[in-house]
């Protein structure tokens, strides 16, 4: 397996045990002992998320619990878990991870238009703008949460 961004030797991984995993629908490979973050970096994945308000590209910048950007939805269906940091998820065979705040994808995010119209979006604008009509709040709330990219609850 050729991973351009991985050191040829060293590290705390078992190079004799490759693992296949999925990130945003793409099949990638890593090794036993990798974290999701280290495997993504080794595979050359640089943009893993988008910023909350302006949807600017974000990459992995930390190595532990302090990582602010690489927060994913891991698993599917009833076993999905939102809000996991890639630096704290140990890679396993068949792992499925999804970015939570880029639409239709983190590479091409249509909500990045917010960066261009940022001057029209003061802090907290969504709390003041979407107050009426009151009956529409459920629709507004769903869309605001989707744009913020906070993940979704497991299926019942």
Task: Name every feature range the model reports, one short phrase each.
Residues 15, 29-31, 36-38, 80, ...:
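Residues in flexible loops and secondary-structure boundaries
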Residues 22-52, 61-71:
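N-terminal amphipathic, basic-rich helices that act as targeting or association modules
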